[in-house]
């Protein structure tokens, strides 16, 4: 599947700072330990049944920042992202709206691409729909069955395939949740704990046997379609290797999705840990309530842009809070971001001396290197802008250095 164009950035003068990120599995901020010249990153993509809202955008903007810091540190980045283009929410929305689910998916994927391009988000090199990956998914299901890590339920009508939570010794290491928490989230987030025939209520579906009216693909274990978690296990490891650097997504994916994606890959491939760092973003709310398709309290990226909002202001609004924290979006947040963008642009015309700007850039780098502290980076630039608007001197070279740094590191165009 085609992604979207790569935004143009230039190299930033000065010395980059090594990136440190909070790892959900280890529960601490730690320096990325990247071996070789290429960093590998997998971020879970959308289920394409509605437009890109700011909750989605905040997640992809976070991993865009990570991508930019990796580039600044001299790494190449091998980035993969899936699209869950065959799943129940897509079927349900298509039925509600009286459209073909494939057409609905295609239209929303196209809109997602457009939104990501507008926001200057670096695209994945591997942008893969579940339907494109059926063969590799069935291979992983078969590997789990062969290893005794999965089983077929005793149901002649619907012989679904499940992965056992006992297949790996370290199940639970990624989320660090208690059994009680797992059971709660599993039931709330697409699990089926009461499915008859399962060995454990937490065992996860990896192949859903064909039901009338649903799409199906042939497999060695009968016609059907893939489960949600194993889709990412297969897509990620087939493109990034059995163990890669960063697995990312929203905090609501920590369990069950990321826990099971890791467990399936580890059991099938015989590795101890699928990702070296599990990075999760906080939820974006509107008036105190998490943005959610089911609740309908959404702010859409394309509608903001159609209303004349500068995409750089959207980025600054999202970055005004720390990526790991749950936070609110509001008209006030957007208004503040728009005013900030205008101040920075005005200040960039008379920014100060080259040496002063290099010090500003150095401090922005330090902030972003420490678990993407965008609030601190913004504060550094706010302080610079205040001084520059006071009595700074004009310097075309300094302006170029500043604009290059802010665009390359933050994706904000001055």
Curated annotation (Swiss-Prot):
CDD domains: CysRS_core. SUPFAM superfamilies: Nucleotidylyl transferase. A motif ('KMSKS' region) lies at residues 290-294. Its EC number is 6.3.1.13. The keyword S-adenosyl-L-methionine does not apply. L-cysteinyl-5'-AMP binds at residues 44-47, 59, 82-84, 228, 250-252, 284. A motif ('HIGH' region) lies at residues 46-56. One of its GO terms (molecular function) is zinc ion binding. Keywords: ATP-binding, Ligase, Metal-binding, Nucleotide-binding, Zinc. Monomer. This is L-cysteine:1D-myo-inositol 2-amino-2-deoxy-alpha-D-glucopyranoside ligase.
